[in-house]
A protein has these predicted regions:
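Transmembrane helix-loop junctions at the membrane interface of multipass transporters and ion channels
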Residues: 576-599, 762-772, 793-801
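Hydrophobic core segments of alpha-helical transmembrane domains in multi-pass membrane transport
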Residues: 430-441, 503-508, 586-588, 601-616, ...
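Extended, low-charge hydrophobic alpha-helical regions
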Residues: 377, 384-385, 404, 445-486, ...
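Juxtamembrane inter-helical linkers in multi-pass membrane proteins
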Residues: 456, 460-464, 517-547, 622-646, ...
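Conserved G1/Walker A P-loop phosphate-binding module
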Residues: 107, 111-195
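Conserved C-terminal guanine-recognition region of P-loop GTPase G domains, centered on the G4
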Residues: 182, 207-274, 581
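Core alpha-helical transmembrane segments of integral membrane proteins
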Residues: 421-521
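Alpha-helical transmembrane helix bundles of large polytopic membrane transport and channel proteins
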Residues: 245, 255-406
Length: 801
């Protein structure tokens, strides 16, 4: 049978893993290995994909992928033996005894003292040794799985001392920061990954950074509540032979659930410092920093890199790895790749490492012979054998050092919440309700109220400044520039800052809580109908906040096809920068119905995006989306510090644009509107330079009902930044009501055009970095054409009604 044949609640033992290439390796890296026990938890509301529990965590697979994995069913008696008729009470007593035993063992382990610096041991202060030269910058790589608290730890380590950039040659985000109180350090926050296999761009970037940049130390953060899954990456990092510390995050949750980890024993077994921490509560951070700096300063490398049992299957894997190490030792040294890491990667079939080593043909033949012999003795193919070796070691370590609770409160809570949020009949209504609530609170309650308060403050400041300049008797031209150009232009945009921050606040909560992963699970089958994976929903939802991070979020998609298609769809998701446009026109033409107008616009963008995807799938992006293999983390309350820092970054970015791009745009527009070709001040704006330039393209918009040159000018400046549309119109319509330029129908057509036409320069630049100049140019032309056609349809059909 295959995993596809399992029913909900049934368990099985995996016997064979199908598939090929990088996908199959990804299955193995996620713990889907022969011999592993797996249980079907549920199906998505539409019947596909499936949610399994394996190695203590939830994993999603599509039916088509589950069909590639063979398994033997585990009888119910094996999984949950039925108690005898008279054994009910004794069974309850036994469960109570087990629970008390776990708590007693946890208390005993919690009392075990973890030695700090200066208390002896290889990882502690010593008087001898050869430390790095004084003044050397201690560079660290912060590595870990997704959803393990890595961002929280990075913020705790560095505070505000962060710099955001990109890794060389690629578009994956890179964050660097200096550890607080240690100016000679530099921490690089690597992307969250599950293994060092080249499946996603993040994994490739992480591997190349560690191999090429060779940091002085690695801080490996793991989720202590899901330690079996996380230690798989730890083992591969240890093979790099770089000084390393292991940060056991969320230890507070482990203790609260009656479990523990015997840190000292794990430290001894792994041969690296193991530090229990809680990044969210700032517990154990100072000890982690002390140990990290110490191992980096003294270059104390992991004391263990050999994880295979010499007795397992007559040492088949052990002999294979050591044979490969002996074969490639010189080549690995020449290529600058740690020999143990290179050997294990060759053993599992990593072609990128094979190319880097530049082996001779006879050496390649010998390598194939060594691997074939191992496969024959082990009874598994090479990739499965190496993955099995790693998980066998992890089970051995965890069995000796980890006291697990029967079920964590976080997991039990997540199961209950998922009954509604991923339930067969409740998931989609819940999603619509949650997103509707977010938009309602943002546009109709919290954001709108705060925006009104800020607008009142800006208006008061404008009046005060106006009165002061008038009393001072400043030159009328300068007076007009300051009040009509800068204050009214920039101020009209600034008043929408609360709405934008409010939207990002809710989106960050949905993402950090773990709900976005559930949305991907729920929507996968629906998105497959338009040629996308469920993972694509996350970048598109982020696109509601801003197209730039939405485009960047597509980097996590393993398929180039899915990534391109998702990037092209993201601009159809109305970004928060367009909110000032919607608010400005809906307040003028549809008073009292602003929230309804905005919601209609958002759903219009989604609908047009779906239609575009269906056409693109049949014409350009033929084929099927990549497999849906994803971990579903437990629900967690987002950290206030992380959310606050994100909001500050978004607010700062908005303010920087308001006082740079928009500020300059308003000044340029004011100058063009104020002067004629001879630089004389005009009394009628229709005689201005701006009117002359905008008049050239105004006829293009005449069939849409907004052929006025002032509207055309505003749309052009909107290409710089969407917020500039309102700022420009505010400057150009001084003393004129916007209702005199447009009718409600033409305003509706204009809103649709603004919804769909080309994204701002920042978004186009981001698309260019991701896909190249041709695709970026295509997006500009394509979005303008689609926007024109849709606006024309609205204006024409509306005129017939």
């Amino acid at each position: 049978m295959t995993l596809k044949d399992l029913r909900i609640g049934e368990s099985a033992k995996i016997t064979a893993v199908g598939g090929e290439g990088a996908l199959r390796q990804h299955f193995l890296d996620m713990g889907v290995v022969p011999g592993a026990e797996i249980k079907l938890m549920k199906l998505a509301p539409m019947g596909d994909p499936m949610e399994f529990r394996i190695h203590g965590y939830e994993l999603t697979l599509r039916l088509a992928d589950a069909e590639k994995i063979e398994a033997d069913p585990i009888a119910c008696e094996t999984v949950c033996p039925k108690p005898a008729a008279d054994a009910g009470k004794s069974g309850e007593k036994q469960e109570d005894q087990d629970r008390r035993g776990r708590k007693k063992e946890a208390r005993a382990a919690a009392k075990s003292h973890h030695p700090g610096l200066g208390e002896g041991g290889i990882y502690h202060v010593k008087t001898d040794g050869k430390p790095l030269p004084e003044g050397t910058t201690l560079t660290f790589a912060l590595a870990g799985n997704q959803n393990c608290g890595k961002t929280t730890l990075f913020n705790q380590l560095t505070g505000a001392n962060q710099h955001v950039g990109n890794f060389p040659g690629v578009t994956v985000d890179r964050k660097d920061g200096v550890i607080r109180g240690h100016d000679n350090t530099l921490v690089t926050d690597l992307p969250g990954i599950y293994s060092m296999s080249p499946y996603t761009s993040e994994e490739i970037v992480t591997r190349q950074f560690l191999l090429d940049d060779k940091p002085k130390g690695i801080i490996n953060i793991v989720d202590a509540t899901n330690i079996e899954r996380n230690l798989y990456l730890t083992m591969q990092l240890m093979e790099l032979d770089i000084p390393m510390v292991l940060a056991l995050n969320m230890m507070d949750e482990v203790r609260e659930n009656g479990g523990t980890i015997r840190v000292n024993e794990m430290e001894e077994a792994l041969g690296i410092p193991v530090i229990p921490i809680s990044a969210a509560k700032n517990e154990g951070i100072s000890e982690l920093i002390d140990h990290a700096i110490h191992v980096a300063q003294y270059q104390e490398k992991p004391g263990r890199a050999d994880f295979c049992d010499p007795q397992d299957h007559n040492g088949a894997v052990h002999r294979c790895l050591h044979g490969i190490m002996h074969l490639i030792e010189d080549h690995a040294a020449k290529a600058g790749i740690p020999v143990r890491f290179a050997a294990s990667k060759l053993a599992e079939g990593d072609q990128m490492i094979l190319q880097q080593l530049e082996l001779e043909e006879n050496e390649k033949e010998m390598l194939r012979h060594i691997i074939c012999q191992m496969e024959e003795e082990r009874g598994m193919d090479q990739a499965a054998a190496i993955a099995d070796m790693r998980f066998a070691f992890i089970q051995q370590i965890c069995g000796a050092t980890v006291v697990k609770p029967h079920e964590s409160k976080e997991h039990a809570r997540s199961v209950k919440i998922d009954q509604i949020l991923t339930g067969k009949y409740t998931a989609i209504p819940a999603f619509v309700g949650i997103m509707g609530l977010v938009f309602w609170l943002t546009f109709g309650v919290i954001g709108a109220w705060l925006s009104g308060l800020l607008d009142m403050g800006i208006s008061a400041l404008t009046e005060l400044t106006d009165a002061g300049l008038t009393a001072y008797g400043i030159n009328p031209v300068v007076h007009s520039l300051i009040i009509n150009g800068i204050f009214e232009g920039v101020g009209s945009v600034l008043s929408f800052l609360p709405i934008i921050v409010t939207l990002f606040f809710f989106l960050s909560i949905l993402e950090d809580s773990g709900y976005m992963a559930r949305v991907a699970f729920v929507m996968d089958k629906l998105l497959r109908k338009i040629g996308l994976s469920g993972r694509s929903i996350v970048p598109m939802l982020i696109g509601f906040g801003c197209t730039v991070p939405g485009v960047m979020a597509s980097r996590t998609l393993p398929s180039e096809r899915d990534r391109k298609m998702t990037i092209l769809l993201t601009p159809f998701m109305s970004c928060s920068a367009k909110l000032p446009i919607y608010g400005f026109f809906s307040a003028a033409f549809f008073p009292g119905k602003s929230a309804l107008v905005m919601i209609i616009l958002y759903f219009t963008g989604i609908l047009v995006g779906i239609l575009f995807a269906l056409i693109a799938r049949g014409a350009v992006f033929k084929g099927e989306p990549v497999p849906f293999v994803m971990e579903l983390p437990n629900y967690r309350m987002p950290g206030a510090k992380n959310v606050g820092q994100l909001l500050w970054e978004k607010a700062k970015d908005f303010l920087e644009r308001a006082f740079t791009v928009i500020f300059l745009a308003t000044i340029v527009i004011w100058c063009l509107q104020t002067f004629d070709t001879r630089l004389n001040v005009v009394t009628d704006s229709q005689d201005s330079l701006l009117a002359m330039l905008a008049g050239v393209i105004a006829p293009v918009f005449a069939p849409l009902g907004f052929g006025d040159w002032r509207i055309s000018t505003a749309l052009i400046t909107g290409f710089m930044a969407k917020e500039s549309v309102v700022a420009t119109l505010t400057v150009l319509t001084e003393g004129i009501s916007i209702t005199s330029l447009l009718t409600p129908l033409s305003a509706a057509a204009l809103l649709v055009f603004c919804l769909l036409y080309t994204p701002c320069v920042a978004a186009i630049t981001s698309i260019k970095r991701e896909l190249g100049g041709k695709w970026a140019a295509l997006v500009v032309v394509m979005q303008c054409v689609i926007a024109w056609l849709c606006a024309f349809a609205v204006y024409t059909i509306g005129g017939l009604l």
